[in-house]
Amino acid sequence: METNNEKSSLDPMFADAARLVVAEQDGSATRLQRHFEIGWNRACRLVEQLEAAGIVGSNRGAKGREVLIQDLAFLEQKLQEIEV
């Protein structure tokens, strides 16, 4: 479970990014960067936050990250647990 500091440090775009990643089954920073028109550093921070939340797996190099959640309904439940 995350502390209040960790929750408040989540990117304001975290929930939207999580929904996109699960819907598209693509956990890449490049996908987030292009879809949300954000910079590379912010996209990478979002991916790191998604990994910490258990939504995407760890970095696998050129293969990209595995999306660990397959279902949007389950994701919404997880987001409520995180209180996003």
Name each model feature, range by range.
Residues 1-84:
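C-terminal intrinsically disordered, low-complexity extensions immediately downstream
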